[in-house]
């Protein structure tokens, strides 16, 4: 059932409480008008957190709980709104599907879903009500305070008595509503059953009794007789403990809080804590001992457990033996020399300066190239505790900084949780998938990460739950990401980015031989001489059954072959596997099925209008044939582009065509026979099911257009890549290593690259560079001379 909601400022109505509310805001007036039309005259009153806000738009600006009330009378103040008298019925939650307040009416559900009391609970509530009555009776006799309603409350039934006692007496001296009063009333409404409601009201009345210094003179005197006058704090604690013990005895559940407090105090004394943390821990322990409800004590104990379980001074011992670290990394990971060298640099500096702040390294590369496993191996090599936090899909800032203790079920953020798990202040902390964080109305987690990853700030990292500054300066942070462009710029500025490119076929083969097969054989309890994978067999699997940048699919395919082999062995009647069985193409096809992938190969025959371009893909690189044809059968002047090309590549076609038109005579096109107004040009890039984008095909498209219009073929052993400018300059491109390797694999032995990409050739394996001719060009004139000869 839906009810209108009325958003109030600093007004929280308790059940059975009658109060008058002035209504003036437009949405509030709409809610009253809607409630007037209903037979029940019921409306939900819920208070906003910030009383200075004029218009509330989101539910997170409201308190979590409200009150269903019945409107008893309405006075129309005309232009100034309404004055309404309401009576509280029950505490309710609003069911909202959206975070934005976009309606007047909403569904609701009761906070107390089962109002029926057991006999045990009724006995306990009677005892609590007796204590409430004693407190009210003593307070009403205090010389500075006069309560006229106290005697009227005595005759009420027990549920009304407790609620109205709270409504009457939980306030300030001058009866004005304060922030604390609002929070106290909200706390009462949040209780899920009547027993907890009564316990909470008793607890709050105790606080009022102490905070307003209205303890009865006789009680003061009794306590003073028992305890020395110099220990007023102990007097107060003793009084509250004794009162609470009476209630607990009636509930039949005396807790072991004293035992827990002794253990916590001993732990505080044993640990080496910073002075501010120790002081905070002792203060919270005092609150724990004096807590009036089991709910409050459990919250405080949970906080103390987190505070004391965090490593504040405990430090692990790092392995500073450079040679052993290098050996460990080489044994576990093939290649990736840049990362290994950076780790050794850090260790060398750490040996000179033990107080050196840890580096913040971000490994960027395609999925499956070993980023996470490499960080794990680094932690093992350095003898560091390892903590991993996955940031993929994190969209709430509180996931990083934690929730404030005022929230129900509050917990620290992932950083503090990770440090607790590590148990030392100098672990290796992996922030996995840092490029996958997103932001929404709950905050930007990337902004919270700025403090974590800034060496100048993370010495004083602040978690909303812990509330004490925590030193992260000794942590060695490492991060991983798939896409550099998706990392927020402010974070990139704090990271040392090392890019991991996709593995070449040869690197995949070596990884399979050195790591994957060894692990697979070990898991299968298989001897290495039972099944032999030759280099040719591994190359066949890599080229025809995987298409990836890393080696995850290769690992799965190798495991599939081994499992099939073992099953076949058990089917053998003799149950004996042959020794030295070599895996060949026939066996691979038998176990893995027909070939799944094939890389593009160069054309064997030369045809005008076809040029080998070069593509950089998520799985490495590939040859990218560019096809151009022209005809005079159409209207003329039309350009057709096919092959699933994205915006940038379409623009490359336009730039290439514009450049060719402006320089047709220069590049051997007979403009007397070929009129651009009379011909239609068709540019096509095969594999139309795959989207293609980027400017790097510019010179290949230009060459294909010239080849088609001049009817001069381009040799198939040549491929090219580079951006074309309107003035003919050749621009820099990316993915040089992957493109060169894929072209070489396809049979190309001559490659044209922009001169600005020369620096990236050092990443290409030497055996390829020794067997291929690289042309470095600055202007398209040089490309034309290489392809068609001197003009």
Curated annotation (Swiss-Prot):
SUPFAM superfamilies: P-loop containing nucleoside triphosphate hydrolases, PUA domain-like, Ribosomal protein S5 domain 2-like. Residues 605-790 form the Lon proteolytic domain. Keywords: ATP-binding, Cytoplasm, Hydrolase, Nucleotide-binding, Protease, Serine protease, Stress response. SMART domains: AAA, LON. It catalyses: Hydrolysis of proteins in presence of ATP. ATP binds at residues 365-372. One of its GO terms (cellular component) is cytoplasm. It is found in: Cytoplasm. The keyword Protease applies. InterPro entries: AAA+_ATPase, ATPase_AAA_core, Lon_bac, Lon_bac/euk-typ, Lon_lid, Lon_proteolytic, Lon_Prtase, Lon_prtase_N. Homohexamer. Organized in a ring with a central cavity. PANTHER family: ATP DEPENDENT LON PROTEASE FAMILY MEMBER. This is Lon protease. It comes from Ureaplasma parvum serovar 3 (strain ATCC 27815 / 27 / NCTC 11736). The gene is lon.
């Amino acid at each position: 059932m839906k009810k209108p909601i009325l958003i109030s400022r600093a007004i929280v109505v308790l059940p059975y409480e009658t109060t008058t509310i002035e209504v003036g805001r437009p949405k509030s007036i709409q809610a009253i008008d809607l409630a007037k039309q209903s037979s029940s005259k019921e409306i939900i009153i819920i208070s906003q957190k910030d009383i200075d806000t004029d218009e509330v738009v989101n539910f997170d600006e409201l308190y979590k709980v409200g009150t269903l009330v019945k409107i008893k009378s309405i006075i129309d103040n005309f232009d100034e709104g309404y004055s309404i008298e309401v009576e509280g019925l029950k505490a309710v939650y609003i069911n909202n599907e959206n975070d934005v307040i976009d309606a007047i009416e909403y569904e609701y559900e009761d906070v107390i879903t089962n109002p029926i009391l057991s006999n045990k609970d009724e006995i306990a509530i009677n005892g609590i009500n007796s204590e409430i009555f004693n407190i009210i009776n003593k307070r009403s006799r205090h010389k500075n305070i006069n309560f006229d309603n106290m005697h009227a409350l005595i005759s009420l039934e027990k549920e009304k008595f407790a609620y109205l006692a709270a409504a009457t007496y939980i306030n300030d001296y001058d009866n004005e509503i304060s922030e604390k009063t609002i929070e106290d009333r909200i706390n009462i409404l949040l209780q899920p059953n009547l027993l907890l409601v009564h316990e909470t009201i008793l607890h709050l009345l105790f606080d009022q009794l102490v905070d307003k210094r209205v303890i009865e003179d006789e009680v003061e005197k009794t306590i003073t007789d028992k305890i020395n006058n110099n220990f007023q704090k102990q007097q107060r604690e003793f009084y509250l403990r004794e009162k609470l013990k009476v209630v607990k005895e009636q509930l039949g559940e005396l807790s072991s809080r004293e035992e827990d407090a002794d253990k916590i105090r001993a732990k505080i004394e044993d640990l080496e804590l910073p002075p501010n943390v120790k002081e905070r821990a002792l203060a919270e322990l005092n609150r724990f001992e004096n807590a009036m409800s089991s709910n409050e004590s459990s919250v405080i104990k949970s906080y103390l457990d987190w505070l004391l379980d965090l490593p504040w001074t405990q430090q692990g011992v790092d392995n500073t033996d450079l040679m052993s670290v290098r050996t460990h990394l080489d044994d576990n990971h093939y290649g990736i020399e840049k990362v290994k060298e950076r780790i050794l640099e850090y260790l060398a500096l750490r040996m000179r300066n033990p107080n050196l702040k840890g580096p913040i390294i971000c490994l960027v590369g395609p999925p499956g190239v070993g980023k996470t496993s490499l960080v794990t191996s680094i932690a093992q090599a350095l003898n560091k505790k390892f903590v991993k936090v996955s940031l993929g899909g994190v969209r709430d800032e509180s996931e990083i900084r934690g929730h404030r203790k005022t929230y129900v079920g509050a917990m620290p953020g992932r950083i503090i949780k990770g440090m607790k798990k590590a148990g030392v202040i100098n672990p290796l902390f992996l922030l996995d998938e840092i490029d996958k964080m997103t932001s929404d109305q709950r905050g930007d987690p990337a902004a919270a990460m700025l403090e974590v990853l800034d060496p100048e700030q993370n010495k004083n990292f602040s978690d909303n739950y812990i509330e004490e500054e925590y030193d992260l300066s000794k942590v060695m942070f490492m991060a991983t990401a798939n896409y550099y462009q998706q990392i927020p710029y402010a974070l990139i500025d704090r990271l040392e980015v090392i890019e991991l490119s996709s593995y070449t076929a040869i690197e995949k083969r070596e990884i399979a031989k050195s790591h994957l097969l060894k692990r697979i054989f070990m898991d299968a309890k298989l001897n290495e001489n039972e099944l032999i994978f030759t280099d040719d067999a591994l190359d066949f699997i890599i080229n025809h059954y995987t298409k990836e940048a890393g080696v995850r699919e290769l690992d799965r395919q190798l495991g599939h072959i081994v499992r099939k082999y073992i099953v076949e062995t058990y089917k053998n009647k003799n149950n004996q596997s042959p020794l030295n069985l070599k895996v060949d193409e026939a066996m691979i096809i038998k176990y893995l099925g027909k070939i799944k992938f094939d890389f593009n190969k160069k054309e064997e025959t030369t045809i005008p209008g076809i040029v080998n371009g070069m593509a950089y893909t998520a799985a490495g690189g590939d040859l990218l044939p560019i096809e151009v044809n022209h005809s005079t059968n159409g209207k003329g002047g039309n350009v057709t582009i096919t092959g699933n090309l994205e915006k940038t590549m379409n623009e490359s076609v336009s730039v290439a065509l514009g450049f060719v038109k402006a320089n047709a005579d220069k590049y051997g096109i007979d403009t007397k026979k070929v009129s651009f107004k009379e011909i239609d040009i068709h540019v096509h890039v095969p594999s139309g099911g795959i989207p293609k984008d980027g400017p790097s095909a510019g010179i290949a498209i230009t060459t294909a257009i010239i080849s088609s219009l001049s009817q001069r073929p381009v040799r198939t052993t040549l491929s090219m890549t580079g951006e074309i400018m309107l003035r003919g300059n050749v621009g820099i491109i990316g993915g040089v290593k992957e493109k060169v390797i894929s072209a070489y694999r396809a049979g190309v032995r001559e490659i044209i690259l922009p001169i600005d990409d020369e620096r990236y050739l050092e990443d290409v394996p030497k055996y390829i560079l020794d067997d291929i001719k690289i042309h470095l060009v600055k202007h398209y004139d040089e490309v034309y001379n290489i392809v068609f000869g001197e003009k």
